[in-house]
Regions:
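Amphipathic terminal alpha-helices
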Residues: 232-251
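Catalytic helix-loop patch of NAD(P)-dependent Rossmann-fold dehydrogenases
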Residues: 30-37, 41-42, 64-114, 121
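NAD(P)-dependent short-chain dehydrogenase/reductase
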Residues: 103-153, 158
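Residue-level signal for the nucleotide or nucleotide-sugar donor/cofactor binding architecture
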Residues: 38, 144-147, 177, 219, ...
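NAD(P)H-binding glycine-rich loop region in Rossmannoid oxidoreductase-like domains
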Residues: 1-40
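Mid/C-terminal beta-alpha module of Rossmann-like enzyme folds, strongest
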Residues: 155-158, 162-209, 215, 246-251
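A short helix->loop->beta-strand "cap" motif at the edges of active sites that frequently abuts
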Residues: 52-55
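SDR active-site strand-loop-helix element
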Residues: 13-17, 57-63, 69, 114-116
Length: 251
């Protein structure tokens, strides 16, 4: 990395590397070494190299280090302490390593930490949350903050271009949405012709479909908005993705 930076001499570096597991975070439970290396150790190495050069940079983190809502029932803000981590002993291995990655970057100089949450967009892809909802036999109907992928990328780049203060930012589309609401939008836009089935509760989901706990949380993106970077309200963003879906019919 030092050699590349010396050769290319960039103005800004983005760390989009990480380990998420395929097809989902359950896979991280069986490859813990690489998960730890990619999500917790690598960010620390990049920090050291960037600070040695005085280089500004951004790290793509995750909102999956939180679960539920804040103590007062409101969405989590950047100053809240993550509650879905190894320290709280209730998380997936993936979430635990992403939380460690943020701990490694505590006090980092000239650094943005961007929290992504359940990425989606209008392109059919196995990593797209909308595609996953279409493919699963049964869904868990919970409320979440999510991020339109292209808007997320634009927001990250705007952080550097607009020279907003360094620090941590929740980069999610304002508001929250449930899986059931998303499937209803899909039907309204004529992109799906199936009847969706839902688990009765999280207990049934964990018993029948998951190997490790999932993060479901509401996050505030007000700090980002106050810095002058706007994203569409989440229902509007999902509607846009469904309206502009690139595959005529998936199901």
């Amino acid at each position: 990395l030092k050699e590349v930076l010396r050769s290319e001499n960039p103005d800004f570096l983005i760390n989009a590397a990480g380990y998420t597991g395929k097809p989902n975070v359950d896979a991280c439970e069986y490859d813990k070494t690489n998960c730890l290396l990619g999500n917790a150790i690598l960010p620390g190495i990049i920090r050291e190299v960037c600070e040695d050069r005085g280089l500004s940079w951004g790290h793509i983190s995750s909102g999956c280090i939180f679960t539920s809502k804040g103590t007062d029932g409101t969405p989590f803000v950047e100053e809240d302490i993550p509650n879905f981590t190894f320290r709280t002993n209730n998380c997936s291995f993936y979430s635990g390593t992403k939380a460690l990655g943020e701990e490694v970057l505590e006090g980092a100089e000239k650094c943005f930490i961007w929290r992504l949450r359940i990425p989606f967009d209008e392109r059919n892809n196995p990593r797209n949350y909308l595609t996953k909802l279409l493919m699963y036999d049964k869904l868990l109907d919970v409320e979440n903050s999510i991020s339109h992928r292209f808007e997320f990328v634009d927001a990250c780049l705007d952080c550097f271009a607009k020279e907003i203060p360094f620090g941590t930012y929740n980069i999610t589309n304002p508001g929250s949405i449930t899986a059931r609401e998303i499937t209803q939008i899909m039907k309204i836009r004529g992109k799906v012709h199936k009847e969706f089935k839902f688990f009765e509760n999280e207990e049934e989901f964990m018993e029948k479909a998951a190997k490790t706990p999932r993060s479901n949380c509401n996050m505030s993106s007000e700090k980002l908005s106050n810095a002058g970077i706007q994203m569409r309200e989440v229902h509007e963003a999902v509607d846009f993705a469904c309206t502009n879906w690139v595959v005529e019919e998936l199901v």
